[in-house]
């Protein structure tokens, strides 16, 4: 990886404000959440991401950050995190051994 920042795998799931009667894109604050995530991708902070097929809404992200503290602080700025639509379930440091993310 050279001088690149480490990678992390993050699993997020629906929070207490998630409305079970609505689809993901119909949740309150979807546009603000999408704009926030697009900005993280433009900054190369978010490398990959998207929903997982579970009964409860879960999403997986591959992020690049100097450390877990910085990562959690940035994710806490997500409008969906601030309003309880989404919450972080797990964070794992990740070493890429197969393939390339660049």
Residue positions per predicted region:
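Conserved, structured core segments of small domains
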Residues: 1-102
């Amino acid at each position: 990886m050279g001088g690149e920042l480490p990678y992390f795998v993050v699993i997020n799931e629906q929070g207490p404000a998630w409305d079970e009667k609505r689809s993901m894109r119909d949740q309150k604050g979807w546009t603000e959440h999408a704009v926030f995530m697009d900005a993280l991708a433009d900054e190369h902070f978010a490398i990959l991401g998207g929903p997982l097929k579970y009964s409860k809404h879960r999403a997986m992200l591959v992020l690049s950050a100097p450390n877990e503290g910085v990562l959690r602080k940035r994710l806490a700025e997500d409008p969906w995190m601030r309003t309880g639509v989404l919450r972080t379930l797990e964070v794992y440091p990740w070493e890429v051994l197969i393939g390339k993310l660049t």
